C-alpha cells in the first residue's frame, strides 16, 4: 500500500486503522530482524547495551522480538555445525523473565592492576536489549548531566 508511514502501520497493527494487523505486525518483526542483524555486527566490536530509540520505539513490542531473534541467531558451516552470531548471552530487558535472569547473573568486583581500585565486573559476557522510553532529548540530557558530574569529580 502506497503512502503508509510507520505510524500508520503501527495503527494497523494495533487495530486502530483499517488494514491487516497480522501483516503489519509481521512487517515490524521483519524490520526488527534486519535491525538485529545490523546490531550483531556492531555488538561484535563494541561492549555495551543495545537500546532501540526514536519514533519506532513506540512499536517496540512488535519490533523487539525480531531484534532479539537476530541477536540470538546462529550461523552454519558447510560441515553442518552451527555457532552463535554473538559470543554473549542475549537478554530482552522488556521481558520480565529475561530481565530477572539478567539481574540474577550478579556482579563481582575485580582489582585494577597497579592500583588499589576495584571495579564492578560481570564474569559472563551478556547483553540486554531494551527500548528507550525517554525520547532523544531527555536521553541526551541525562548523558550530558552524567558527563558533567564525572568532570566535577576530577
What positions do the PLM features span?
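ATP-binding/phosphotransfer module of carbohydrate and carboxylate kinases, centering on a glycine-rich
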Residues: 1-154
Amino acid at each position: 500500500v502506497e503512502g503508509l508511514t510507520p505510524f500508520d502501520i503501527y495503527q494497523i497493527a494495533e487495530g486502530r486503522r483499517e488494514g491487516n494487523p497480522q501483516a503489519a505486525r509481521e512487517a515490524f518483526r521483519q524490520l526488527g530482524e534486519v535491525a538485529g542483524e545490523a546490531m550483531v555486527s556492531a555488538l561484535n566490536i563494541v561492549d555495551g547495551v543495545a537500546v532501540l530509540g526514536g519514533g519506532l520505539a513506540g512499536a517496540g513490542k512488535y519490533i523487539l522480538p525480531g531484534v532479539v531473534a537476530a541477536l540470538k541467531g546462529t550461523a552454519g558451516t558447510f560441515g553442518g555445525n552451527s555457532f552463535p552470531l554473538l559470543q554473549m548471552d542475549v537478554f530482552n530487558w522488556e521481558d520480565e523473565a529475561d530481565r530477572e535472569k539478567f539481574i540474577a547473573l550478579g556482579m563481582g568486583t575485580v582489582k585494577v592492576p597497579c592500583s588499589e581500585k576495584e571495579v564492578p565486573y560481570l564474569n559472563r559476557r551478556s547483553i540486554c536489549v531494551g527500548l528507550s522510553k525517554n525520547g532523544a532529548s531527555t536521553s541526551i540530557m541525562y548523558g550530558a548531566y552524567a558527563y558533567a558530574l564525572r568532570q566535577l569529580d576530577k
